[in-house]
Amino acid sequence: MKKMLALLVIAPLLVSCSGNKGNTDNEEFLKDTNAFDILMGQFANNIENIWGINEVLIAGPKDYVKYTDQYQTRSHINFDAGSITIETLSATNSVASLRQAIITTLLMGDDASNTDLYSDANDIQISREPLLYGQVLDNTGQAIRWEGRAASFADYLLQKRLQKRTSGLHVIWSVTIQLVPNHLDKRAHKYLPLVRKASERYGIEESLILAIMQTESSFNPYAVSRSDALGLMQVVQHSAGRDVFKMKGKWGQPSRSYLFDPEQNIDAGTAYLSILKNSYLAGIENPTSKRYAVITAYNGGAGSVLRVFSSDRDRAVGIINNMSPGDVYQTLTTKHPSGESRRYLNKVNSAQKNYRR
């Protein structure tokens, strides 16, 4: 498994029109961001000290990574590639460490609110409705829901598929498990009832919600980013989260545990799409042009979308309204200052077409 040193420098968060808030909010944002930056730096240092500089692996939007056993063992689910890799450095209890990690990973639920991905705490909750149920088949071709079947499969893997490699001075023992080919569709289907509920509540297309979830997290409920965006729809507490709470008449911003709850995350992400659609970008008349603007704004902020067309917001809306949807799409995917935002519109738009079928 290819390892990459995680980027730990926290880039400034790209927020929507909510960026024009007072100094108090900005000070709170900087305080929280600096604290998260320090936490990430300490966490990466712990991993580097134990695994080595070339083996630093940290959770991301589409990668679940959990360390246990004093950082000696880790579980990595690559939700994009559809693979699970369980590894350990333990020289004396390698088989036992791997066995426990395999069982726990196969049976964990999708509520990440009580799991700390930035520590070695053994806090993973086994669920009667495992996140990976139906996405992993054991050696007999059966889905895994209960501990007995997970334990039997773990024993099979350790007997038949145990691998050994060296990295620097370390010997690393590992087992790799492939998810079923349609794992992405299975995760999407799992969240469809929650998506439908949010779609009806906020008037946002189901296909758009699903496309954003796929692009943001590949339907990983444990998703985190280096800018501390959280959960399935990668909601940032200090910007989108604060706007959503304001819309709901609540003070402050959602907690991390709030955004790690799948239902609340999907609700918050969809509510923010409705804010972009009906408030920040309400003046855009053509529904297709507005959809392109909303998608791009979800990634890079409504203000940056409008500035692509003019520094004056009212004039920007007028320019957009005088353009065809195709020209709006072309402009946003070629002239937006953020390469990530340019690519984001293309990815979400393509994914949405698949969910409309």
From Swiss-Prot:
EC assignment: 4.2.2.n1
GO cellular component terms given for this protein: cell outer membrane
Residues linked to a lipid group, N-palmitoyl cysteine type: 17
Keywords: Cell outer membrane, Cell wall biogenesis/degradation, Lipoprotein, Lyase, Membrane, Palmitate, Signal
Entry's Gene Ontology BP terms: cell wall macromolecule catabolic process; cell wall organization; peptidoglycan metabolic process
Record membrane topology: Lipid-anchor
MF terms (GO), sorted A to Z: hydrolase activity, acting on glycosyl bonds; peptidoglycan lytic transglycosylase activity
InterPro entries: Lysozyme-like_dom_sf, Murein_transglycosylaseC, Murein_transglycosylaseC_N, Transglyc_AS, Transglycosylase_SLT_dom_1
Reaction(s) the record says it catalyses: Exolytic cleavage of the (1->4)-beta-glycosidic linkage between N-acetylmuramic acid (MurNAc) and N-acetylglucosamine (GlcNAc) residues in peptidoglycan, from either the reducing or the non-reducing ends of the peptidoglycan chains, with concomitant formation of a 1,6-anhydrobond in the MurNAc residue
Top-rank EC class of the record's enzyme: lyase
Its biological purpose: Murein-degrading enzyme. May play a role in recycling of muropeptides during cell elongation and/or cell division.
PANTHER family: MEMBRANE-BOUND LYTIC MUREIN TRANSGLYCOSYLASE C (PTHR37423:SF2), SOLUBLE LYTIC MUREIN TRANSGLYCOSYLASE-RELATED (PTHR37423)
Family indicated by similarity: Belongs to the transglycosylase Slt family.
The protein's name in its UniProt record: Membrane-bound lytic murein transglycosylase C
Protein source organism: Pectobacterium atrosepticum (strain SCRI 1043 / ATCC BAA-672)
